[in-house]
């Protein structure tokens, strides 16, 4: 069945209100897209992260009359004559198949591949992490995840313990285990992340070496030789005393989820505990690494 798609530009301030209005008018689904190919900005606590220029995309049944909806939008004081919109007919597709076809195996560094579970691995002799890409957590396609995976691939992890702080899908912890780490600990505030990490560990036969905790449940005195945290600048800054305490003297640290302009501030924050390296960059994003100073 075909659909009618309405696309309109909005500020992040008004996107949620427009979404609610369109749903009330009869839209069957709403999605948000980046209007200017810009990095998503970091939200305040409790806010939904959106782009400054957000495109609201609404789907309606094919026989739906959109003229009254457009008139309603034009009457809104924050849109009015400035309303920019586009209406087009969308043919129905097997969207699950379309989504699956968009994911391919990706190589990170020299040894590591991230492979969707429905694809054949390109190099059976490589270190292959089999993943089911999901909507909520890391799949390796984002520059910050890629930066962390490349860093892990560059290390000799044989026999080492690692902490994945803010583990999400568990992709970094699982990759570290497949690269030779003896044990990994994943920490996340989200129950769904814990479940996703457990599923991906089982898919890669490393579940017996991965421990997963909510922050309030992590063991007292937990420390590791390697810690990677791919979260956001705000949490990295606020949680710095907690994060540094998880790394053994001489241990290695990687921090990502940072925009380029945030790297210097976060590096300075951690320099009291770590000998920090120069940042690595990919697109608009950065990764910081360092070695824990002796106590």
From Swiss-Prot:
It holds the Pfam family PrmA. Its EC number is 2.1.1.-. InterPro entries: Ribosomal_L11_MeTrfase_PrmA, Ribosomal_PrmA_MeTrfase, SAM-dependent_MTases_sf. It is found in: Cytoplasm. Its main location: cytoplasm. GO terms for molecular function: protein-lysine N-methyltransferase activity. NCBIfam families: prmA (TIGR00406). PANTHER family: ELECTRON TRANSFER FLAVOPROTEIN BETA SUBUNIT LYSINE METHYLTRANSFERASE. Belongs to the methyltransferase superfamily. PrmA family. This is Ribosomal protein L11 methyltransferase. It comes from Shewanella amazonensis (strain ATCC BAA-1098 / SB2B).
């Amino acid at each position: 069945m075909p659909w009618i798609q309405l696309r309109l530009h909005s500020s992040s301030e008004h996107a949620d209100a427009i979404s609610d209005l369109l749903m009330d008018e009869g839209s069957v689904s709403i999605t948000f897209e980046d209007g200017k190919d810009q990095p998503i900005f970091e939200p305040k606590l409790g806010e939904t992260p959106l782009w400054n220029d957000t495109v609201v995309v609404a789907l309606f049944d094919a026989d739906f009359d959109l003229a009254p909806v457009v008139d309603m939008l034009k009457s809104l004081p924050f849109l009015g004559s400035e309303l920019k919109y586009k209406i087009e007919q969308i043919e129905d597709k097997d969207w699950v198949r379309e989504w699956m076809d968009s994911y391919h195996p990706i190589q990170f560094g020299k040894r590591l591949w991230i492979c969707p579970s429905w694809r054949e691995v390109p190099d059976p002799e490589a270190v292959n992490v089999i993943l089911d890409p999901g909507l909520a957590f890391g799949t390796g396609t984002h520059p910050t995840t890629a930066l962390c995976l490349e860093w892990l691939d560059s290390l000799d992890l044989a026999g080492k313990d690692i902490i994945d702080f803010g583990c999400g899908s568990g992709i970094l912890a699982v990759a570290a285990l497949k690269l030779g780490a003896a044990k990994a600990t994943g920490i996340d505030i989200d129950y769904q992340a814990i479940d996703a990490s457990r599923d991906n560990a089982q898919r890669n036969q490393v579940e017996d070496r991965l421990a997963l905790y909510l922050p309030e449940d992590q063991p007292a005195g937990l420390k590791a030789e390697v810690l990677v945290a791919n979260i956001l600048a705000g949490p990295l800054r606020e949680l710095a005393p907690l994060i540094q305490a998880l790394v053994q003297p001489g241990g290695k640290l990687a921090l990502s989820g940072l925009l380029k302009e945030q790297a210097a501030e976060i590096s300075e924050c951690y320099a009291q505990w770590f000998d920090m390296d120069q940042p690595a960059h990919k697109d608009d994003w950065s990764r910081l690494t360092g070695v824990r100073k002796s106590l």
